[in-house]
Amino acid sequence: MIPPDSVRPRYGAGCFADVPQTIRQQLTGQGEEGLVGGRYKKVVLFFVDAFGWRFFAPRRESYPFLRHFDEQGRVQQITAQFPSTTSAHVTCMQTGMPPARSGVFEWQYYEPEVDEIIKPLLWAQLDSHVRGSLDIEPEKILPQGTFYQELAVAGVASHIFQPA
């Protein structure tokens, strides 16, 4: 049974899964409004894994960097997707798809195409620590296309900065 004080994802009304669509609409005017209305020439998204509202809210006044966002930008509390895992959220930002569409729910899962447990973000078998060692083409089991490619088709240049 789900505890009554659990917070459920608000898909379509304030969930992490709504972030890509919100950015798409703000930059291109295409699609539904999303989390925040308005059109913009530039949008900057800082995606800091595991730094949710319960960490941000009590620190926002203490750190100038966070306070700047509060005063000069847009800060909004949203719900996590389900499951609330790095794999699901990173894949959502890369593809624009929630877990139910991308198929990436967890850090590790059984993949029938290779008949083993894989680590999709590392593209490796469960017992391997070597990135890219999975012996199947990603196109066979992962979503194709990226959120950034969709933006490019709409004439929007986008950039991603992340660890290699």
Predicted regions and their residues:
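Active-site nucleophile/metal-coordination loop of metallo-enzymes that catalyze phosphate/sulfate
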Residues: 1-43, 50-145
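Structural beta-sheet core signal
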Residues: 45-46, 160
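Feature for exported/extracytoplasmic and membrane-associated proteins, marking the mature portion
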Residues: 139-164
